A protein has these predicted regions:
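A generic structural signal for short beta-strands and their flanking turns/coil linkers
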Residues: 1-3, 10, 32-36, 55-58, ...
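Extended, compositionally biased flexible segments
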Residues: 1-25
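Short, structured patches in soluble enzyme cores that scaffold and shape functional sites
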Residues: 9-11, 32-42, 60-65, 95, ...
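Active-site/binding-pocket entry motifs
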Residues: 13, 20, 44, 67-68, ...
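RNA pseudouridine synthases
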Residues: 40, 48-62, 68
């Protein structure tokens, strides 16, 4: 794309690095996406790319869990329904400060489901780098300390698997990590509670 795709995830999607992913009651196409999380440390509005990284406090691992049915078929090209479900935003385990990460554009990342390799990549292949993203998003909204921008995912998501897509189901275990930022482990569980 010419410009970054921007969507919101609800606060209720945020969980810890090792918390469960709870499938929505009508889930049929819940997918995984390892992403680099960029945590804003200083208010940013109309920031130039050359100054963008001065507004970053640090980085973390994010699993941008996505229900593709909600995202693609029930949203009229607005992705938030499919990406903002409860528990669909595991972050952490740590916020690693920028002084510890010399180059956010050269971090290996990986994700496995039930011990099987699904995603392998490096942040150097991102379509838009961290500075590009901070500068671009700051044109449209004020970024506040604590805001998190996630940066896109490498190949290997379930909907892209051949010969046919694979999606998460109750009982699956997702493990993922980024070099220098730690690892996550989530168990996938069926919906619990009231509809």
């Amino acid at each position: 794309p010419e410009h970054p795709v921007v969507f919101y995830k609800a606060e209720t999607c945020i969980v810890g690095a090792n918390d469960n992913i709870m499938l929505p009651p009508e889930s049929t196409h819940t997918d995984w996406e390892i992403e680099l999380g960029v945590i804003i440390g200083k208010t940013a509005r109309y920031v130039d790319k050359k100054d963008a990284l001065k507004h970053v406090a640090g980085y973390c691992v994010v699993n941008d869990v996505s229900e593709r049915e909600y995202q693609m078929k029930r949203s009229a090209s607005q992705w938030s329904k499919g990406k903002g479900c409860d528990t669909f935003g595991p972050i952490g385990p740590w916020l690693v400060t920028t002084d510890e990460i010399k180059d956010p554009q050269n971090l290996d990342m990986w994700l496995d489901v039930n011990g099987e390799k699904r995603q392998r990549g490096n942040t150097r292949t991102m379509i838009f780098g961290v500075a590009d993203l901070v500068a671009d998003v700051s044109k449209y909204m004020t970024l506040l300390p604590g805001d998190i921008i996630t940066t896109g995912t490498p190949p290997g998501v379930g909907m892209g698997m051949k010969p046919e897509p694979k999606y998460l189901k109750a009982g699956d275990v997702v493990t993922l990590g980024i070099a220098g930022l730690g690892e996550q482990r989530q168990s996938v569980v069926a919906f619990k509670g009231k509809k």
